[in-house]
Swiss-Prot record:
Organism: Thomasomys notatus (Distinguished oldfield mouse)
Coiled-coil region list: none
Cofactor annotation: heme b
Name under which the protein is recorded: Cytochrome b
GO biological process, one term: mitochondrial electron transport, ubiquinol to cytochrome c
InterPro entries: Cyt_b/b6_C, Cyt_b/b6_C_sf, Cyt_b/b6_N, Cytb/b6-like_sf, Cytochrome_b, Cytochrome_b_C_euk/bac, Cytochrome_b_N_euk/bac, Di-haem_cyt_TM
UniProt gene name: MT-CYB
Binding positions (heme b b566): 97, 196
Domain of life: Eukaryota
């Protein structure tokens, strides 16, 4: 008689995804971040659920309800900081996961890559509406500035912004709907993750060599379950160090001041994980142009499969494109730094140069390097 895990309709799904799944024998630790993202998502949903039990989405009580969670709820401070810093860990894993996909050419698994881009956008939307909920100064002004960008859309812009706000400014209606969005979106993300995995398991995983690994597969369990478990322990260690020793290091001090529509903070900026896109937005003097650049800074990921002219899979044996890749990563870090700086010389100029470089590397330099490498290696 066949063992239950191979026969039971539900358990066999888990078996095919996490136990008997044939995986390449040579995938490195860069492949750990998918499972780490799953763990981050579970942490966020669980801590978020407990926070939602005590939070009130009303402009008069939202700020004090967060203070109440931290002061009066048993381990409320821990749940709140796990949720806030868990979001940062989520984005660190997300950026590394995408970066690995670019480096090793995983974008050639088209359906998986495109669902991944949708996941990235959905996660960014979730984080944005979540940041508004504590109703501090930066929550309020961040919501005002970012939603106001939609007014740049010709003809329908102003109407659209007021429709999203539920009035003529960011107010009670906005906070209530943002809470509703923040509650529902993680479950949509979970559904998309399942679709992401479904498409990945249709083709099988990529590997560092970029070669077909069908002739050399090993079972996911125990090899990669143990490897993933080590990654999870390291992730939890870093998260707990952040939460217990430096809970506010990634936050903004302005968010400890209750929202005040009559007093604008000196420097309005989003959370650190949006700063690169914010820098690109600010580097264009025209409002509509800035909004388009902001959207394209993420959607440009969809262009990677179209701009890949290389005859080799991944960058493991392509030093020219490898160099450009690391310049691209360094440029992203520069953009992140610029996004957190005031709008004045020399930061504006550095931001503009970095923004141009961001798009130039992806659209011009990398495809050119692909063609040059093909030519050098006589891969026609």
């Amino acid at each position: 008689m066949m063992i239950m895990r191979k026969k039971h309709p539900l358990i066999k799904l888990i078996n095919h995804s996490f136990i008997d799944l044939p995986a390449p024998s040579n995938i490195s630790s860069w492949w750990n971040f998918g499972s780490l993202l799953g763990v981050c998502l579970m942490i966020q949903i669980l801590t978020g659920l407990f926070l939602a039990m005590h939070y009130t989405s009303d402009t008069t009580t939202a700020f004090s309800s967060v203070a109440h969670i931290c002061r009066d709820v048993n381990y409320g401070w821990l749940i709140r900081y796990l949720h806030a810093n868990g979001a940062s860990m989520f984005f660190i894993c997300l950026f590394i996961h995408v970066g690995r996909g670019i480096y090793y050419g995983s974008y050639m698994l088209l359906e998986t890559w495109n669902i991944g881009i949708i996941l990235l956008l959905t996660t960014m939307a979730t984080a944005f509406v979540g940041y508004v909920l504590p109703w501090g100064q930066m929550s309020f002004w961040g919501a005002t500035v970012i939603t106001n960008l939609l007014s740049a859309i010709p003809y329908i812009g102003t109407t659209l912004v007021e429709w999203i706000w539920g009035g003529f400014s960011v107010d009670k209606a906005t906070l209530t709907r943002f809470f509703a969005f923040h509650f529902i979106l993680p479950f949509i993300i979970t559904a998309l993750v399942l679709v992401h995995l479904l498409f990945l398991h249709e083709t099988g995983s990529n590997n560092p060599s970029g070669l077909n690994s069908n002739s050399d597969k090993i079972p996911f369990h125990p090899y990669y379950t143990i490897k993933d478990l080590l990654g999870v322990l390291l992730l939890l260690m870093v998260l707990m160090i952040l939460v217990l020793f430096f809970p506010d290091i990634l936050g903004d001090p302005d968010n400890y001041t209750p929202a005040n529509p009559l007093n604008t903070p000196a420097h309005i900026k989003p959370e650190w994980y949006f700063l690169f896109a914010y820098a690109i937005l600010r580097s264009i003097p025209n409002k509509l142009g800035g909004v388009l650049a902001l959207i394209l800074s993420i959607l440009i990921l969809a262009a990677f499969p179209l701009l890949n002219y290389s005859k080799q899979h991944g960058l493991a044996y392509r030093p020219l494109t490898q160099f450009l890749y690391w310049v691209f990563i360094a440029n992203l870090l520069v953009l992140t730094w610029i996004g957190g700086q005031p709008v004045e010389y020399p930061f504006t100029t550095i931001g503009q140069i970095s923004s141009v470089l961001y798009f130039t590397i992806i659209l011009v330099l990398m495809p050119t390097a692909n063609a040059v490498e093909n030519n050098i290696l006589k891969l026609h």
